[in-house]
Amino acid sequence: ELYSKHEESNLGQIIADSFAYAVDSVDVAVVPSGTIRDTYTKGDITVEDVYNSFSLGIGKDGVAGYPLISTYLTGKELKLAAEVDASVSDFMTTARLYSSGLNFTYNPNRMILNKVTDCYLTKEDERIEIQDDQLYHVVTDLYTGQMLGSVNKLSYGLLSLEPKDKNGNPIENLEDHIIKEDGKELKAWDAIARYMRSFDDTDGDGIANVSKYYASTHEHKVVDDSKNIIDLIKKPN
């Protein structure tokens, strides 16, 4: 489903929300479809299931699983990330992005790199307009951070997403920005497991139940399929 349908995914959403849950003061958490290796079936979800869903890679510590990293992007770059998803991921389905904190609407009928018609942040269900020059705290896994940093090269300089530190300086080595707890890397799969454990036990069996919130989607990524000429040319970006 992640590759066949270009739309919001509750699987991608729960993983993105897991990253945001695991780290303090996050504006946006990003998960591309290419890093998600398995889904969750109805019934008990084990730690093994969680690990299998995000089992790619190895950290600087030599332990299996990509760690989370802490970076910053400008508001303009966040909008560009949404546009990369809207315009490029139909050709490169592994680049489909699922995010926590970033919402956007796109029209697949518009010109390439001009498909996003609305893009904004959310916090506690409140809409927050994106300021192009402001730095925003972005959490993702190490592999995704490396891929974001390669957008400039892959697009021959047409697009640029440059991960930065909190002072706005370009990051030279993303491994220096791995999130650690007590000296240990915080793995992406561990962040997901923690989030799963944080849910309420709604049936009294002593095991947390996945929130019903994830039984549906919530307009984090909205597809506007209008072919009206006005809708196709308004709000050029």
Task: State where each predicted segment sits.
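Catalytic centers of hydrolytic enzymes
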Residues: 1-237
